[in-house]
């Protein structure tokens, strides 16, 4: 059954009808209904203002207000659908995990949290707003990881094939920054609809070849996933990027415009915004051990953190050994029996919070308790070493490249499926109504 918008409008009508002695204020309105949720006009206005401010700061031109509004509404719809999914599966980012993320960001920027707060507030954003924006970003990242990762399979044959290619090419591949515009077509289009989309794509291509700004054109015309970023995909090598890109850009040079290319989604136009060579380098590996406690209905967040703080005191005083506590208490089945030992690995294979913590430690140092998606940890950095790229590295690299390519493709498929299954209604602004 489709959600009814009448209750929503009734609540707003009730709010409007209440007497007040204050001066009249502009009344916010429902701009979009997404399943049982809504997007307010003020949310759209605020996001448009943010995009415009960012464009001014970057000296970047923008399309018409109506085209920009369409892109912003689409972004808000997809964001809200993902947050609704997170809520349905019980995914919530708590304050302790959020605090840990903020500490990591401050550390990366070589600031204290207080200094970072001061900088944020000097730029006109309250620290409370920043926290909630970051909580939303972390939630989106986690729900994408949870929902998309399980849709991806990387076969041994794919890895073997790519390892062979990597060995043939070496690690001096080229990374491309891609500009992408998608002129979409309706579901099950007829010949007239296909022809209309094809003409639109060719018209866009001609404007680009005549020197029209790519980013502005993408924001105004593209239905692709990066439209609001000017259609720009960050640097990827040919093995990381979506298959459609990889099939057409091999050998292309900076500034080349390719297309239109027809696919099931529509007509694609691709521009090589930049290209750079990959440099080979030594790999830094770390040997570490950790103790993991997983919060549960029996073990609260605060209790898990307090237990690890107590373990730290016992280790530092010589009352207990790290490996003994790991065997007794750690809830990581892969390392607990080995005294928490994780073996040699690149830090980047771990979740971001764990990798950032390892990178901040000196040899033999034990971290303070910190939170990741897996739970609460303390970790000790035992050794660092530099190694050359090995067969195992090539295998890991191949898996990572294939996974990233498939993740980008499956993420868009997942978003498209959610949108197709959702009840969405966009209400026209008052000024556009007859």
Curated annotation (Swiss-Prot):
InterPro entries assigned to the protein according to its UniProt record, in alphabetical order: OMP_Chaperone_SurA, PPIase_dom_sf, PPIase_PpiC, PPIase_PpiC_CS, PPIase_SurA, SurA_N, Trigger_fact/SurA_dom_sf
Domain commentary: The PPIase activity resides only in the second parvulin domain. The N-terminal region and the C-terminal tail are necessary and sufficient for the chaperone activity of SurA. The PPIase activity is dispensable for SurA to function as a chaperone. The N-terminal region and the C-terminal tail are also required for porin recognition.
Protein source organism: Shewanella sp. (strain MR-4)
Cysteine disulfide links: none
Gene3D superfamilies: 3.10.50.40, Porin chaperone SurA, peptide-binding domain
GO molecular function annotations of the record: peptide binding; peptidyl-prolyl cis-trans isomerase activity; unfolded protein binding
GO biological process: Gram-negative-bacterium-type cell outer membrane assembly; protein folding; protein stabilization
Known role: Chaperone involved in the correct folding and assembly of outer membrane proteins. Recognizes specific patterns of aromatic residues and the orientation of their side chains, which are found more frequently in integral outer membrane proteins. May act in both early periplasmic and late outer membrane-associated steps of protein maturation.
Enzyme class name: isomerase
Pfam families tied to this protein: Rotamase, SurA_N
Keywords: Chaperone, Isomerase, Periplasm, Repeat, Rotamase, Signal
Subcellular location: Periplasm
Residues annotated as domain PpiC: 173-274, 283-383
Keyword hit for Transit peptide: no
PANTHER family: CHAPERONE SURA (PTHR47637:SF1)
EC number: 5.2.1.8
Protein name stated in the entry: Chaperone SurA
Any one GO CC term of the record: outer membrane-bounded periplasmic space
Annotated SUPFAM superfamilies: FKBP-like, Triger factor/SurA peptide-binding domain-like
Signal sequence interval, chain numbering: 1-22
Domain of life: Bacteria
Catalyzed reactions: [protein]-peptidylproline (omega=180) = [protein]-peptidylproline (omega=0)
